């Protein structure tokens, strides 16, 4: 039987065993390594972790919310997703966070750039471009964001008819956040590929400060004691456009994870 690749779990173990102890903004404390990378071949399954259950409905909903260009948590709440509640103000606003920058990056002359539409257009018309980058790190608006972007930039790359995506994440909560981010950007890669009539290639995750919070150490030990199971298969109905996907278009089959492991979010 072919061994199941476990690049996330391998990195999690390395950070646990070899990381440096650091203080952090939240006051929780972390064990951390800098400048790490994980690679997944998207042809070999959808990288939704099996060593613990990942709430795929929330992964899908957050990505659809980003693609809407939304900055308010109400749409998420209406779809039973509460992962952004801790950072929202009393009106549900988060400021010009991910979706706003993706879909409506402001220019000095008052225009707005739809980076997602531009990225898809480039895949179709100039797939060999080395400039196909989407950034959420708008320095001029960071102070107005409830939380500066952690996963802040991704680049798209086409070779042999296959689309690969590399994400850079400056701050990586390895236990809670990163499993979610891996699934989200893998899904986005599939969506871009489908809309551009490409196959999927690799998803490459690159992390800056890759950390395990001190209050997640027992959960990490539990997760690393579990044997990985086969990855599920993504079922993706082709929508009329990249912005027309709904929950009903996106599902995973044969997802058989170990049970959920809960952990407290550091705010």
UniProtKB/Swiss-Prot annotation:
Keyword Transferase: yes
Annotated localization: Cytoplasm
GO molecular function ontology, one term from the record: thymidylate synthase activity
Binding site for (6R)-5,10-methylene-5,6,7,8-tetrahydrofolate: 55, 173, 266
Catalysis: reaction(s): dUMP + (6R)-5,10-methylene-5,6,7,8-tetrahydrofolate = 7,8-dihydrofolate + dTMP
InterPro entries documented for this protein: Thymidate_synth/dCMP_Mease (IPR045097), Thymidate_synth/dCMP_Mease_dom (IPR023451), Thymidate_synth/dCMP_Mease_sf (IPR036926), Thymidylate_synthase (IPR000398), Thymidylate_synthase_AS (IPR020940)
Keywords for the protein's UniProt record, in alphabetical order: Cytoplasm, Methyltransferase, Nucleotide biosynthesis, Transferase
Location (main, coarse): cytoplasm
EC number: 2.1.1.45
Domain of life: Bacteria
Alphabetical list of PROSITE patterns matching this protein: THYMIDYLATE_SYNTHASE
Any one of the GO CC terms: cytosol
Active site: 150
GO process terms (BP): dTMP biosynthetic process; dTTP biosynthetic process; methylation
Keyword Methyltransferase appears in the UniProt entry: yes
Pathway field: Pyrimidine metabolism; dTTP biosynthesis
Residues the record lists as binding dUMP: 25, 130-131, 170-173, 181, 211-213
Membership in a protein family: Belongs to the thymidylate synthase family. Bacterial-type ThyA subfamily.
Function: Catalyzes the reductive methylation of 2'-deoxyuridine-5'-monophosphate (dUMP) to 2'-deoxythymidine-5'-monophosphate (dTMP) while utilizing 5,10-methylenetetrahydrofolate (mTHF) as the methyl donor and reductant in the reaction, yielding dihydrofolate (DHF) as a by-product. This enzymatic reaction provides an intracellular de novo source of dTMP, an essential precursor for DNA biosynthesis.
Database matches in HAMAP family: Thymidy_synth_bact (MF_00008)
Quaternary data: Homodimer.
Protein name: Thymidylate synthase
Species of origin: Corynebacterium efficiens (strain DSM 44549 / YS-314 / AJ 12310 / JCM 11189 / NBRC 100395)
């Amino acid at each position: 039987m072919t061994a199941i690749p476990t690049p996330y779990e391998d990195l999690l173990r390395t950070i646990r065993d070899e990381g440096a102890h650091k203080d952090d903004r939240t006051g929780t404390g972390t064990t951390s390594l800098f400048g790490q990378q994980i690679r997944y071949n998207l042809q070999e399954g959808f990288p939704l972790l099996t060593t613990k259950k990942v709430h795929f409905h929330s992964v899908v909903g957050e990505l659809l919310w980003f693609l809407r260009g939304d900055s308010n948590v109400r749409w998420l709440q209406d779809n039973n997703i509460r992962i952004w509640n801790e950072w929202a103000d009393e009106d549900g606003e988060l400021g010009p966070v991910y979706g706003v920058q993706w879909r409506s990056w402001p220019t000095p002359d008052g225009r707005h750039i739809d980076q997602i539409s531009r990225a898809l257009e480039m895949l179709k018309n100039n797939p060999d471009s080395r400039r196909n980058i989407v950034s959420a790190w708008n320095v001029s608006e960071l102070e107005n964001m409830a939380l500066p972007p952690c996963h802040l930039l991704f680049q798209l790359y086409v070779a042999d008819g296959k689309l690969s995506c590399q994400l850079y994440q400056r701050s990586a909560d390895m236990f809670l956040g990163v499993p979610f981010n891996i699934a989200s950007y893998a899904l986005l890669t599939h969506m871009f590929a489908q809309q551009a009539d490409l196959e999927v290639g690799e998803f490459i995750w690159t992390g800056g400060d890759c950390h395990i919070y001190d209050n997640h150490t027992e959960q990490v030990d539990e997760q690393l004691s579990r044997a990985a199971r086969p990855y599920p298969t993504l079922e993706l109905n082709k929508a009329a456009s990249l912005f027309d996907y709904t929950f009903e278009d996106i599902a995973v089959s044969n997802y058989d994870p170990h049970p959920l492991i809960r952990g407290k979010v550091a705010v």
